[in-house]
Amino acid sequence: MTVKIRLARLGCKHRPFYRVVVADEKSRRDGKQIEVLGFYDPLQGKEDADRVSLKFDRIKYWLSVGAQPTDTVESMLFRAGLIPPKPMVVVGSKNGQKSTSQHVSPITGEILN
């Protein structure tokens, strides 16, 4: 059983509201959940404190036992400072030059080997 940390949609039409939940990968988006870890209200202002609320200790626990966050939740956790960012890949130019891909740190911009 693979466990994901993902968003479950609540609210009504044109007024979305999401819960950050732990659920089995094969369950439906709004289906059975193992645990609720917080909420996300996309219609609140960006600087509003009520936009995102997360239970940091429970998220750390689920990440430690192998739960995989979805891309959206992963970006939320990065902004909250819980996980490091994914390394970015820089691809060479298309002008016929030798193309080499290099990994770049998204925080410092340094090339990683």
Swiss-Prot record:
Molecular function per GO: mRNA binding; protein domain specific binding; structural constituent of ribosome
* Residue ranges, annotated region (Disordered): 93-113
Q: Does the keyword Coiled coil apply?
A: no
Pfam families referenced in this protein's UniProt entry, alphabetically? Ribosomal_S16 (PF00886)
Q: Which GO terms describe its cellular component?
A: chloroplast; chloroplast envelope; plasma membrane; plastid; ribonucleoprotein complex; ribosome
Q: In which tissues is it expressed?
A: Expressed in leaves, stems and flowers, and, to a lower extent, in roots.
Domain of life, per UniProt, equals Eukaryota
InterPro entries, alphabetically? Answer: Ribosomal_bS16, Ribosomal_bS16_dom_sf
Where does this protein reside within or beyond the cell? Plastid, Chloroplast
Keywords tagged on the record: Chloroplast, Plastid, Ribonucleoprotein, Ribosomal protein, Transit peptide
Q: Where is the composition biased (Polar residues)?
A: 94-105
The transit peptide segment here is 1-15
Gene3D superfamilies, per the entry: 3.30.1320.10
Q: Which GO terms describe its biological process?
A: embryo development ending in seed dormancy; translation
Please give the chief subcellular localization of this protein.
plastid
Q: In a knockout, what does one observe?
A: Embryo lethal, arresting development at the transition from the globular to the heart stage of embryonic development.
Family the UniProt entry places it in: Belongs to the bacterial ribosomal protein bS16 family.
Q: What else is known?
A: The chloroplast also encodes a gene for bS16c that is transcribed (AtCg00050).
What's the protein name? Small ribosomal subunit protein bS16cy
**Organism this protein belongs to:** Arabidopsis thaliana (Mouse-ear cress)
